[in-house]
């Protein structure tokens, strides 16, 4: 009864904002003597089939919880592996581990860790439950950006790795498959398609054999725990790898077509604000690094870690929020336009943090500080049209193609972007690479490789079009055509490859690409 009354008021424009909605819920609960206010997900569950597409969209736009989760064009689903030791031991700041029944480097109280624990670390159940949660709060889950978290995945037993990934695909497919290859094949046409698969690991566990294995799983991105570009800081934190490991892992991954995301830390023992700033300048300017994406993690003091003991004894002092905010702002101010800042700070509940950044909205605080101090971040995420203006109607006539060329990891990179000049917003982008020293057999005869193609804005179901937003308007195809032109005319290449997510392969097939090993290929002759 109450759900239908709310629905009628939304459709008649009597409820226009979240505040209107909350007030109306309270009024109706009092009117009907209800003790509990219904969540938005319950209203969404009971939408009548008689609603038109426009009416449904109007309701979804108001009731969708945390709309930012799908403003980049996809729905993110993160799952965690079961607790296991890291091969090198344990870093000084690192919480978690098998003794606490949590994956290494997690407290067990992060939302993803709690979902994993509640589902007994079963990848199928984690996947199904997370997709159902996202659907229940109004998000499209046709296109899934899938992330495997929880320690050093590439160091796990091979059988566990393959079983885990297969179960993730089975969860997206909602059916049991006989093998990993079968699960991947089913996913090409599934309701929830894996358009990207991310694996988290350490730089010293990202060699050729590790890359070959994750490519076989359908991986499109690797996240490396680089942390810093100073060997003395890595040694002091007990990291167990060197800067050279990060350089090698970056080149091998890029030359295989993978997108590369760095996890970078500030405030580590042995570092300082000046050193932290320099560390970020180096990764953006030194061609041996140049990641496509970064996550910025302030060092946190958590009980049970070696760092906690150092902090208690006065041997270590954490950066305060007053120090962190301008530091991160300065970092953001020089991030290149071809880099996306994926995340700022860990998802750890503040009561678990003894010292360090405790505010959960650090990104928003930094943004406000930058605005007040006349600073701007030009990273991809800050300029994605979905974050700048999610309701903007993007007309192809208002969009301009831009290009940035740079050298990275012994290869040539071209970053193509379609940008809305009036909004100063990115509509879509593509990363094209001419590899330096690829080890993959498919790439031995030359050719360029598209490492990323993405159209941003609110995620739309596959096949659906919308007047507003940027998705499904041919932007991806136009970027791909320009990449093909550059490959043929400027690099004299006879073929172009794409490292596609399993669930995006049909898109490339429609554009003339065929399967070639783990890649999609198009002959340009």
Task: Kindly give the residue locations of the regions a language model identified.
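Flexible, acidic/Gly-rich N-terminal and inter-domain linker regions that tether
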Residues: 1-126, 130-176, 337
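Conserved non-cysteine loop/helix-boundary elements of the Radical SAM core domain that shape
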Residues: 109-126, 146, 150-261, 265-322, ...
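C-terminal accessory regions of radical SAM enzymes
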Residues: 316-431, 435-437
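Conserved acyl-donor/pantetheine-binding loop and adjacent beta-alpha core of acyl/acetyltransferases
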Residues: 419-471
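Conserved acetyl-CoA-binding loop-helix of GNAT-fold acetyltransferases
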Residues: 466-486
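Conserved GNAT acetyl-CoA-binding A-motif
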Residues: 486-500
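Conserved active-site alpha-helix within GNAT-family acetyltransferase domains
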Residues: 500-519
